[in-house]
Structures are given as C-alpha cells and as structure tokens.
C-alpha cells in the first residue's frame, strides 16, 4: 500500500521506471535493497545525467521537511524558503496568464518488460482518454468492481 500523493513526478527530466527490479526503499523510506535502481534512462535535455550534476527542485514545505518519508531530504539542503504556498503561486500564475492550456508532457514511462501487463481500475470515463496517453499502450479490459473500469497496461 502506497498513497498516490507520495508518487512525485519530477518535471524537466525524462526517465523510465523499471518495475522488474526490486524497490530500493520500503513505504517508510527505509533502504531495503540499497543496490537496486528502478529509475533508468534518466536524462536532462536529451542527455544522460551525470551523477555529479546538481539540480534545484521546487517543492512545498511538507516534502522539504521530510513529509512522505522520502530519503535524503534534509533541512540543511534547502536553499530558499518562500512564504507562498504552491497553491497560491499556481493561482497567481493562472490569473496573470488569463488562459492556460495544461498538458502532460509524458516525461516518464514504465520501462518495457517482455510479455508483461499490469491490470488497474479507474473511473469509467477513463475509457474516453486512454488512447490519448502518450507512450503507453492501454487496453480496455472490461468492467471492474463497484462501477470502475478495468484496463490493461502493456509493458
């Protein structure tokens, strides 16, 4: 069990998640397979990331203070603290722009795993959009439990 709000997407880089490898951390952020790396093909500007390369990550105070039990997050690594909430910054941006056209840039995907599929359930209106998801082969797999729609993701 892993709450979906703890699944962070890092924008500005591209990467794949190799689910055939064991998880490095458990749900509490404790290293259980320290030599494992599920994140593969990590790139910035179309080039592999140098392990010594530095990046600045904008986040909220919950995550920066260790919320979500993400490893290697420490207060001494924070370089700027703003009084604004993420929500307020986004609202101001939308007001300033007047109109925005948000779209997912498909910067991450699952790494291919031969002869493997994953079954998941979601709202039935997902059937209207499954074909629009870039880089993913998603098939309708019928009806799920309690009014949900069932889908098959081909890895």
PLM feature spans:
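Catalytic centers of hydrolytic enzymes
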Residues: 1-155
């Amino acid at each position: 069990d892993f709450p979906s709000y703890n699944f962070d997407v890092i924008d500005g880089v591209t990467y794949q998640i190799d689910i055939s490898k064991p998880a490095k951390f458990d749900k509490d952020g404790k290293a259980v397979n320290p030599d494992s790396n599920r994140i593969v093909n990590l790139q910035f500007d179309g080039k592999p990331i140098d392990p010594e390369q530095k990046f600045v990550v904008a986040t909220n105070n919950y995550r920066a203070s260790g919320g979500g039990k993400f490893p290697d997050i420490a207060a001494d690594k924070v370089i700027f603290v703003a009084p604004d909430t993420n929500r307020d910054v986004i609202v101001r941006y939308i007001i300033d722009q007047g109109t925005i056209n948000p779209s997912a840039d498909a910067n991450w995907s699952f790494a291919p795993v031969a002869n493997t599929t994953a079954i998941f359930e979601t709202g039935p209106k997902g059937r209207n959009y499954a074909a629009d998801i870039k880089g993913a082969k998603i098939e309708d797999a019928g009806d799920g439990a309690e009014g949900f729609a069932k889908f098959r993701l081909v890895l």
